[in-house]
Regions:
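Short loop-beta-helix segment that forms the pyridoxal 5′-phosphate
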Residues: 165-171
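Short conserved active-site loop signatures built around small residues
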Residues: 176
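Short, high-confidence coil segments that cap the C-terminus of an alpha-helix
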Residues: 191-195
Length: 195
């Protein structure tokens, strides 16, 4: 059976936004859970969440988002992003750099990408609020596209020019495990060289 190696890591999490921060948080038992203001309302039974302080993505307009300056996202791309796509984009940039993969390797038909996402309920909620307040004609035509589970995969594929196998997996809390396992199988079965 073909051996498979993890050669690049990237993180955007509530316990750190790079491998050094995540390792430090794990070693020092820091959890990353906070009480965000948006949950501090009587009707919300949930009062805590994992927050990512380096990113300010409250605006419904992605062009107003604030995130670490080392991540470059072309305007044409970010307009179709939901917050989870930006998090994935930034962590993927770290992983690509960590693995020392160049853009030509990514465009090789033997390079694929499998992602895990349930979509963006936040984006759906914001778009429905806008539609309810201003009418359907005021809605962004990309509203649904930027909210569905597949948006993560097709945004990353298009942005990086990936021509190999691509798929978005949605299976609740098992989604990431399924994406990793399926990507592992693609390499072991000789269908892809890198995922």
């Amino acid at each position: 059976m073909t051996e498979v190696w993890v050669t690049g890591l990237g993180f955007v999490t509530s316990i750190g936004c790079d491998s050094a921060q995540v390792e430090d948080s794990l070693l020092n038992l820091r959890h990353g859970i906070a009480c965000p203001n948006m949950l501090q309302v009587p009707e919300s039974p949930v009062k805590v969440a994992g927050t990512i302080d380096e990113f300010e993505l409250d605006s419904s307009d992605p062009e107003d988002w604030k995130f670490p300056s080392e991540y470059k996202v072309p305007r044409s791309l970010i307009r179709s992003f939901s917050p989870h796509v930006l998090y994935a984009w930034c962590s993927l940039q770290q992983a690509i750099k960590d693995a020392n993969i160049d853009s030509q390797d990514l465009k090789d038909p033997e390079s694929g990408i499998y992602t895990a996402s349930g979509g963006s309920m936040r984006s759906i909620h914001k778009h429905f609020e806008k539609m309810d307040r201003n009418g359907v004609m005021a809605c962004n035509p990309l509203a649904i596209v930027s909210s569905i589970p597949g948006t993560l995969t097709f945004n990353l594929v298009a942005a990086l020019g990936i021509r190999g196998s691509s798929m978005g997996l949605v299976s609740a809390c098992a989604s990431s495990g399924h994406a990793l396992g399926t990507a592992l199988d693609e390499i072991r079965l000789g269908r892809q060289k890198r995922m």
